Amino acid sequence: RWLLLFSVGVMLVSLGLALVFNYKYLDVIEEAIFRAVYLWKGSYNYMFTTLAGIAVVIVGVGLMLIATRFVIRSVITVLLPDNSERLVDIIYEKRRLGKGPNIAVIGGGHGLSVLLRGIKAATSNVSAVVTVADDGGSSGRLREDLGIIPPGDLRNCLVALADTEPLMEKLFQYRFKGKSELAGHSFGNLFIAAMTEVTGDVETALRESSKVLAVKGEVLPASKEHVRLDAIMDDGTVVEGESHIPEVHKHIRRVKLFPPHVQPVQAALDALTNADAIILGPGSLYTSIMPNLLVDGVAETLRKSKAVKIYICNVMTQPGETDGYTASMHAKAILDHGGQGVIDYMLVNNAPISKEMQAYYAKEGAYPVEVDEEAINALGIGFLKADIINESDVIRHDPQKLCRNVMKMVDGLRPGNGSDHYMRSRHN
């Protein structure tokens, strides 16, 4: 009905303009107006036709504006039934986020998704480059059964960047229970697996999945090839498979990919090249961050990049992977695998951890990571100490605190909010 009202308005505007400019095909209407004026006034008034035309134009424009307003409201009600009153806020938010810096994040596991939940509040120009070496759980089973790259970490990143209803997030994270073949699989993993087979390509599958979840940014696998992560221990033994590495509880000398030369996803390299800032972690040092650096071209792209390159250090050591590691040892391991210049700065926690929580983690063999400042300085890396944790029943990085401090570093390592910053020269 509003479109009909708009059409009536257009007709009235056209009629009014014709009357104003004395269009010849409206002689009948003009004559009728003259007769009416003559009967009313007793004389002819040629200005009345012009005034009548102007009045008709005004009425027509008014009807068009009213119709347009209600048409827009009807469309918004359909597309945004619960948020129609927030349209201006939504438009403003999208414009603000669209002007944010280009940030590329590298990693995998739970830690990366925590960072993404915070970063998406500062910019929508986010690219997550995700490890594909996972071989455990639902991801490992789908990898073996369907021959696809493991979808678990990709799913977590999609959900973290999603701007959708909580129910959709719960759906993608839902794990089937019971004793059937579906037991242990998450719906999101199955969805990505199905989308990959339907589209024939995992990159396309992720793009289409991003539309379903209204993702802010993009999620990219580091590679589309099937890879295995192996670890060489200090005693020379080799452990095959990402999920088996922490189980042996030996000191890791180095990790490697099999096959040794793995082709990268070009879109991932482009995201790193075009980034204003590149963030590594947080996440498992050897099993979430390192596999990305071992993909051909990734470490080289990082070294050549002029972006601010930040490593977010873990808060606690990880049993079987980083036992006894200090902050500088985390950074040195990254430099040993990726080369000098893959990171410029570190973000480390300086918030105290309660004795009760330390005792709880000590039972699992995990301890707070010591920030050894002099050793970090010796590596030529700048660092920022800040409160970046959320201590509840477990110790986790806090998304908002991570975002605030990362953006501070991206904007120039400005001090404030009770944190200490230490700038070192950037690598050339």
Which role fits each region the language model picked out?
Residues 1, 324-428:
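C-terminal functional extensions of proteins
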Residues 292-299, 325-330:
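Charged helix-capping and loop-helix junction motifs
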Residues 1-83, 99, 131-249, 405-407, ...:
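Electropositive, gly/pro-rich neighborhoods at or near active sites that engage anionic ligands
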Residues 221, 225-284:
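Active-site gating loop/helix substructures
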Residues 124, 305-309, 343, 381:
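A short helix->loop->beta-strand "cap" motif at the edges of active sites that frequently abuts
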Residues 85-100, 263-269:
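A short, basic/flexible loop-to-alpha-helix module at the beginning of a structural domain
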Residues 110-116, 282, 287-294:
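Short glycine/serine/threonine-rich phosphate/pyrophosphate-binding segments
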